[in-house]
Each structure stands twice: as structure tokens, then as C-alpha cells.
Amino acid sequence: MAARWSSENVVVEFRDAQATAMSVDCLGQHAVLSGRRFLYIVNLDAPNEGHRKISRQSKWDIGAVQWNPHDSYAYYFAASSNQRVDLYKWKEGNGEVCTSLQGHTRVISDLDWSVFEPDLLVTSSVDTYIYIWDIKDTRKPTVSLSAVAGASQVKWNKKNANCLATSHDGDVRIWDKRKPSTAVEYLAAHLSKIHGLDWHPDNEYTLATSSQDNSVRFWDYRQPRKYLNILPCQVPVWKARYTPFSNGLVTVMVPQLRRENSLLLWNVFDLNTPVHTFVGHDDVVLEFQWRKQKEGSKDYQLVTWSRDQTLRMWRIDSQLQRLCANDILDGVDDLIDGISLLPEPDKALQPQDSEPQHSSGHGDEEALKEDFLNDLLVGKKTDQLGLPQTLQQEFSLINVQIRNVNVEMDAVNRSCTVSVHCGNHRVRMLVMFPVQYPNNAAPSFQFINPTSITASMKAKLLKILKDTSLQKVKRNQSCLEPCLRQLVSWLESVVNQEDSTSSNPYALPNSVTTPLPTFARVSNAYGSYQDSNIPFPRTSGARFCGAGYLVYFTRPMTMHRAVSPTEPTPRSLSALSAYHSGLITPMKIRTETPGNLRLYSGSPTRSEKEQVSISSFYYKERKSRRWKSKREGTDANNRPIKAAGKVIIQDISCLLPVHKLLGELYILNVNNIQETCQKNAASAMAVGRRDLVQVWSLAMVATDLCLGPKSDPDLEIPWAQHPFGRQLLESLLAHYSQLHDVQTLAMLCSVFEAQSRLQGCPNSYGPFPQRASNLASHSRYPSFTSSGSCSSMSDPGLGTGGWSIANKDTEQTSTPWCESSPDEFRYSNLMYPDHREREKDQHEKNKRLLDPANTQQFDDFKKCYGEILYRWGLREKRAEVLKFVSSPPDPHKGIEFGVYCSHCRSEARGTQCAICKGFTFQCAICHVAVRGSSNFCLTCGHGGHTSHMMEWFRTQEVCPTGCGCHCLLESTF
């Protein structure tokens, strides 16, 4: 068919618009052009008679604009600008912004109104989120969809109210808004970015994609691995959209090197040559949309907007529309007009499951016409795909030369009888085909007499036939001939198994092992979207173990990659669908026989089918004739097969700063710190750690009893404030933090914690745990999470979120003796009304060699070392270290009432006082400590058990303590 071309019918120029997007309303009356400063509303009935403007204040261009497609909301349109979508209302010649939708964090790439629900709008963005908005409640999106990559296109399905599609670079995801957690299907559509996406107006499963890779592809998302058809082009395709009539498609190309900027009209059933060319634009066509058909007219109008700042309208007459129709539908109108004159069909030719025609009224006549038209359309589409149109055609195409098989076919009753005779076994089976076959409807199989196989063999055979038929009908393919071949192959395998057993009289009967079929079995192919969250299997890897071992595995010598080593390994199993669909060089799948049903076999063989499996990604077929002849002459069952690579466990304890032997030799004698330091120094000398010998020698000197602090702060400065006190210890901890020696860190912290307890220093966690947590946040050892996995046998309650090892300078950050900051002074004044109490508390902190501000970090050292000891099996040593882990109170969360202890009058939280350990309050009626549910008056502070208070105030109005407070009235807000 020769390509036709035409010029436009209406041309309107807008030189000052500088518009980047255009949209036509559902009534066909107005078009909106989106510029940076103004939105131009054009009356399409009189485009040359001036236009209206809506001013906008934004430095961002409009990326997408679209009118609401419903007549009742025809005056609404949405426009996206950077991260925001503005909803405009155009009514009676005036336009204004109604509201804005704000939720995306990156630029919005596309938007689309729902065809079924006028209030729903979907937006896509580079921030990887797709939001569905309800314009009646614009505070937040009603549905949120999340993908790995940013979305460039989003379109609602035109036949399914819950379905929508998004494009992400070269991929397409199909979503169901009722299941927002994951996509329904995944299409590896193109190798380059997708510029256009459009659903078929009549088929809910079909869509078209246009891409930078110079092609338009047609998809049925129920068959995601192979496109239905492809339109190859010489240049990238900017847009491709279906026409509202017949089976047309309009494409806009991205011009290269000053080529013509024309639109092309195609017939989707004949993509060899465009049926029409729209010539006229001088620059890139940015947008095109269809205008609603006028009443009483069969013509359509195509409205286009180009970068040359011209709006053009093209008339599509009935002659052009017929060019997009199928050849088989030429003259269908005449056939439909005379269809009522057709004679009544012979009842003997009707299938049994057809419904009789009870009347010849107008409704039945219309239904018959519609069925006739649908049959023509379906028949034409089926011919295009090269598939059988009817069950009778499938029967005629079956290869009746299959050995040992006799098939009696009955197309009228939609059934066939299969007879197979192999060896001593005979199988006769009735196959019934449903009306929907093969459209995702599998046939049924039933054994009939005479059938000689056992009941267990019948069950196995039925399972094989059902699996084979389901696999085919899911792709809308015929399954009769594949089922027949499976039936014959299975019977032959049973006969061969029996012959091999009878030929060896000394063979023992095997009642446990089920004989495997001898027919070729193809390993599973992967690549569906359900596999997108499954990582691609590793063939090599390494992992450090917390017990001082490195575990690694390698690829066996027989395994080679079938693609170039420079090609990246797929990140997930779903990526293999690209290989399957032919987008990337396909790989041969190996055929597995019963002798080598393994994932990684040492002797792959050839197959005629090109599918993708995990193993085929790594196998490379060898073409050496010498190797091939040697392989054919060797029995696969007798040749040793290396199923996988080696797993190697390497001892790397010599590379680590921690030593298992030191963990066994170290001691923690809380009654004699000097002896502990001395023996630990000897243990370090035994393993060759001379640096630790010096460390433990310094620790022994620092913990000498003669350096113990005095109880009176006025007598002398504590040794901890000496340069060789806390400052020296902090420098040691900082040094071994840089070396990641958690063993030394934990042991030093435990020893000096034990020394502080012997000196009678209080726990760093006092009655105000908030203070300790605030100080700990300024520790010089900022925490990081350890990546080592914990043993499943360890106590989860003692696990740590990580211990901190950082490269920090060792300047002194502890508070000098008898010095405090203004904040600390104000805080201490709130805590201690008497300055002597404050000075005493400060002295208790200054006596400690370990800075109380870092107590939480020191606990992390001990917990981490405790996990290492657990992995070494030194559980008693672990218990000794964990004894020195402090037990701070739970951090305060939320809002609760403060309580003064009834005994010591100090502030307390909870039912027990942290100072005097007594119960904080008593019931005003029973004078027993309150531990459970309680009620108190916010005015007088009195109260007690809830049950007692309720019983009291049923008859009384004043407080039970006699304070005179009317608690019920005072507590009413």
C-alpha cells in the first residue's frame, strides 16, 4: 500500500506562547497550551478568534497537562510543574487554580486521569513513587506505588478501572491499585528509555510502547516475555498512540539531522508501510490528541502542537479510517445490514454447548451482529499470530504420524479419544475441551476402558498431562499435540524401565525409588516479575565469620559464562526475561536427562529450544568435535560429575586483633584487681603481645590501693584527675579503638569498673537517667553497627546494636576537678538545693577513672566482646564480662505524670523510687502501695486504687484524705 500524505486543515500560530504541553478537553471545545507565564485556552471551534489566558507565577515549565475526561468534570484540568500538580478550573471564560497536590520530592514526569472515576488522578515522578490522588481530599495521596527506578510514563487502563501501567527506563510495570505493595507484571520492553505508553482502547491486556531504540512494540502483559508485534523505525519514536477508530496507530518520530517532522498513521495489522503521513510542522511535534467526534459526523480531528509554536488540526475522513481497518472487515457494514436475512443454521451443525435462539427480536439481532463482528476480529488477529482459529483447525493440524497413537477427533462435541499401545501397556483416554479453550482454559482428561496401567501410574500420568496443558493454555496456545507426545514418551520410559529390570535376573526390586521418565526434561526457566525480589544466585562469594574464620566458595571448573565477561551479572531472576525475549543475545538451555538432573552439570547437552535458566547463563557450549565424540562415547551415568565448587573455610585469627587464647587465659578477679592485671600481663606475654604487657602493667599501677581517692573532696585532688589517671586511660582506649581491638577495650573497662565498685563509687545511672544519656551522646567513641552475624543460640536480650571504634584525637574532654559549665551548674542547682550535696556528687564522679559520660559506650564494648566469647564457646568468660554491664533504666517515652516519693520526697518515675527503693505512693483509702491501675486528682495530688476511688466517689464529693478538695469538679476539664 502506497503511503499517502496530506496537509493540515487548520493552522493557528502562537508565537508568544512558548508552550511545552497541550491537551484537548473531552467535549472537544477547548485546548490548553501550557507556557511558563500563561496558560492559553483556545476555542477549537474558532481558533483564530483570539484566546484566553490564565496567568501563573512559577519559574518552572509545565511538564504535563491534561483535561479531565469526564463530561461532568470537563472544566477541570491538571498541570504539573516541578514537584507540584495544580488543579485548574475553567468555567464561563474564567480560569483559576482550585488546589495543588504536593507529595513528590523530585520532578513529576507524567500524569493521567482515570477513565472510570472522575476524582482519581495518577502522577509519576523521578523519585520512584507513583501517587494516586483523590481530588476531593488533596492532603495526601490515597494510594502510593513504589518502584526501584523513577517512572517516566503512567497511563490508566481504558477497560479495567483498577489497572495502570508505568514505564521505568526500558521496563514497564503493570499495577493493580488494590494491591499497591508490588506490581502485577513486569515487562522488559526495550533496551533504551521508553518515551510513550498507550493502552489499546478495546483490549484491556494490550498496550503499545515507543522507545529511544527506534521501535514501537505491542504487548499482551499476560505474555510478558515476548512482544506481539514490532514496528521498526529508522529514528527514535517520541509518541505512539492508538486511534479512537478501527486499528490505527499514530506515531511521532524524533527528527535526526533536519529530517521532516511529520506524523505517521499506521494499520497495526500491516506495519510494513504507513497508510498516511501528516506533513506541515517545521519542528518537533510535542503533543497530539484526538478531538471528540461531532454529532452526525463520521470524521475525526487530530490536534497537534509543535515546537514551531503552531497548533494544527487534521481531518480524518471515513476513507482514511477504512485504511486502518482489517482487510477482512472491508464491506462488513453490508454484511451486517443483511445478516437478518440469513437462513436459520442447520441444528445438526451446531455444537452441543451452544445456546438456542428463542426469539428473533431486536436485542438478539444486535447480539448476533456483535458476535459476528467479534468473530471476524478474533479470526483476523489469530491469523496474524499464526495460531489455530478453531478446535477443528487444531485437529486438522495435529501430526497423526506420532508412533503408537490413534486419535479419534469429534469437533462438534469438542472432544477426542486417544488410544496408545506401548509394550504390554494400553491406554485409552477421553479428552474434553471447554468452550473457552485455549484461552486460559485447559482440557480435562479421563481414562476409559480398556486401560491396563495401574492406579498409581494413572495418577502420575494425569499430573504430567495437566501440567503440560496448563503451561500451554496460559499462553493461549493449543496443547493437544504436546500432551500426546508427553503421553507416548512417558509410556516408553515405563516400558524401558521394565525391560532393563527384567534383563538383569540378579537385580533387587526397588519399591522406594520411582522410575524417572527417559524423555528429555528442560530445566525451569526464570524471569517473571514474581522473581524480581529474588537475587541472582551467586557462583562465588566470601563471608567473614565472627569466630575468626573466612568462608568462601568458588565456581567449578566446568562452569563458564555464556556471555562476555564484561557483561554484568543480572541483579535478580526477573532480569533474565530480557534474554528470553531476544533483547539480549539468547543462550542455549541444556536438556537434562535422568542421569544428570543437576543445576550445575559437568556435561551439558544441546537443545533445540532457546529458553533461559540459571545454569544456562553460565554454561558455554563447546564446539570441539573431539570433545563431542568423546562425550558421545562415554556413559554419562558412569562419569563423575562435579556438581558444585568447593566451600573453603580459612582460619584468619592471625589477622584479627582479638585472640581466642587470650580469651581463655584472661581473668577477672574482682576481689584482687592487682592480681588480675598481673596475670593478664603474663598471658599477653605468652601470646607475644608486648604492647598489652605494658598496658596491663600501667593498669596495675593505676589501680594501686595507695592511689585510692579520699572521701573528703577538700583533702586532695583524686588520682583520676591526674594526667596519668583518666587522661592516660582515655588515650589507651582511643588507641585500641583505632585498632578495633574490642577484646582489650572490654577487659580494661571491666577491670576499672570493678575497681570503682571496690572504692564504693555509685553507679553512673542515678535517679535522673536523662542526664546520663545526654552525656553519653557526646562520647568520643561514636557508635557504628557491627556487620558480623550473631549466633542464633545467643541471648537476644544481651545483644548490642554495635560498638564504636573511631579515629578520634585524644585531647582531654573530661571536666576538670571542681569545675563545671554554667549548664551543669544550673542543672545541679535544680537537683541539689544544697551546694555541698552538689560538690559531693561531683567529687564522686571525679574519683572514677572511667568517665561516667561514656558508660553506654563502655557497655557496648563489653557486649560485643561477650558475643565473641560466645562464638568461641567460652560461656563462663562471657558471663564474667557481662557482669560489669550496667543496667540503666528504660528510656522515657511519651508523656506521664511525675510523682514525688512518699518516703524520701524525691522525684520518681514508675511505681518504685530509684533512690530509696520504696513504693512511690500509697492509696488514700487502704494505705497500701499502689502498683496497678490508679487514679489521682491533678489539683491536690491525692488518689489511689481505681476501684477504691470509684467506690468512694459514688457517694462522696470531697477528697478521702480530708484536704477539702472537690476532686471530681477540679479534675473536669
From Swiss-Prot:
Residues where Zn(2+) 1 binds: 901, 904, 913, 916
ZnF locations on chain (C4-type): 900-920
Repeat region (WD), residues: 57-98, 103-143, 146-185, 189-229, 232-276, 280-324
Residue ranges with Polar residues bias: 351-360
GO cellular component, one term: Seh1-associated complex
Similarity comment: Belongs to the WD repeat WDR59 family.
Record protein name field: GATOR2 complex protein WDR59
The species this protein was found in: Gallus gallus (Chicken)
The encoding gene: WDR59
